[in-house]
Amino acid sequence: MAKISKRRQAFAAKVDRQKLYAIEDALALVKECASAKFDESIDVAVQLGIDAKKSDQVVRGSVVLPAGTGKSVRVAVFAQGEKAEQARAAGAEIVGMEDLAEQIKAGQMDFDIVIASPDTMRIVGTLGQILGPRGLMPNPKVGTVTPDVATAVKNAKAGQVQFRVDKAGIIHATIGRASFEAAALRSNLSALIEALQKAKPATSKGVYLRKVALSSTMGVGLRVDQATLAAQ
C-alpha cells in the first residue's frame, strides 16, 4: 500500500490541479501515470450544467466507442423465436425467457449487460429489484429494450457504453485502457462528448459542458481544456 501511495504522490506532483491541459498532453500524462501491474482503465468525468434533481434534466444514453472499451462483454438477451436466434447469431452468450428470469432470481448472473425485446418486458419487469440496483435493468433510453436485439448485441460487443448523470450532475465513463494509443482514446472521448451534446436537455440553461477531467484507475485526475477537444 505504501508503494502505491508513493507512486500516486509522485504523479500528483506532476499534475497541476489548476491547469487546463490540452487533450494531447492530458492523454499522455494520464497514460504515463497508469503504471500499475494491470491494464488500468482510462476514465472521464464530465460536469454538466444541469439540475440533476429535475426529472426533465436527467441525462442518460449510450454510445458505441469507435475504438472499443478493451473489455470483453458477456451479453444476456430476453427474446424468443426468430429474435432469439438472431441474438445468438449476433454473439449473445445467454438467451432465454422464463428460464433466464429464474436463473437471475437464483443469483446466477454471469453477464455484463441485459438486452430485451419489447414483448418480453412482462417477464423482465418482475426483475427490477434485482437488475436495477446493479445497473443491469434494460431501458429503451440506452438501447437495451429494442425490437432489433441483434444490433443491440453487436453494439454491446463493439464497445457500447451507457452513461447516466449522477446526483451531482456528473457523467462518469470509461473510454478505454492505458494500453490504447492516444489517438484511440481521443476518438472514444470525442464520441462520448458528441453523445452528451445530443442528449442535452432542452431545459438546460447556460454552459452545458462545464468541466472535463481524465484519470486512470490508480492515477490522479486532471482537467482538460475543452477548446482542444474540437481541434483535429
Curated annotation (Swiss-Prot):
Q: Name one GO biological process term.
A: translation
Record's keyword terms, sorted: Repressor, Ribonucleoprotein, Ribosomal protein, RNA-binding, rRNA-binding, Translation regulation, tRNA-binding
Sorted alphabetically, the Gene Ontology cellular component annotations on this record are: cytosolic large ribosomal subunit
- Judging by the UniProt lineage, the source's domain of life is Bacteria
A GO term, aspect molecular function:
rRNA binding
- Keyword set includes rRNA-binding: yes
The record's InterPro entries line, in alphabetical order, gives: Ribosom_uL1_bac-type, Ribosomal_uL1, Ribosomal_uL1-like, Ribosomal_uL1/biogenesis, Ribosomal_uL1_3-a/b-sand, Ribosomal_uL1_CS
PROSITE patterns assigned to the protein according to its UniProt record, in alphabetical order: RIBOSOMAL_L1
The keyword Ribosomal protein appears for this protein = yes
**Assembly with partners or alone:** Part of the 50S ribosomal subunit.
What's the stated role of this polypeptide?
Binds directly to 23S rRNA. The L1 stalk is quite mobile in the ribosome, and is involved in E site tRNA release. Protein L1 is also a translational repressor protein, it controls the translation of the L11 operon by binding to its mRNA.
Family membership: Belongs to the universal ribosomal protein uL1 family.
Q: What is this protein called?
A: Large ribosomal subunit protein uL1
Organism annotation: Burkholderia ambifaria (strain MC40-6)
